[in-house]
């Protein structure tokens, strides 16, 4: 699963 930290 992609990390949300990459977007935020």
From Swiss-Prot:
Modified residues (Phenylalanine amide): 8
Keyword match Metal-binding: no
Main location: secreted
GO biological process: neuropeptide signaling pathway
Keyword Secreted among record annotations: yes
GO terms of molecular function: hormone activity
Listed GO CC annotations: extracellular region
Subcellular location: Secreted
Keywords, comma-separated and alphabetical: Amidation, Hormone, Neuropeptide, Secreted
Family of the protein in this entry: Belongs to the NPY family.
Described function: Neuropeptide. May be involved in the regulation of adult diapause.
Name recorded for this polypeptide: Neuropeptide NPF-2
Lineage of origin: Eukaryota, Metazoa, Ecdysozoa, Arthropoda, Hexapoda
């Amino acid at each position: 699963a992609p990390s949300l930290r990459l977007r935020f």
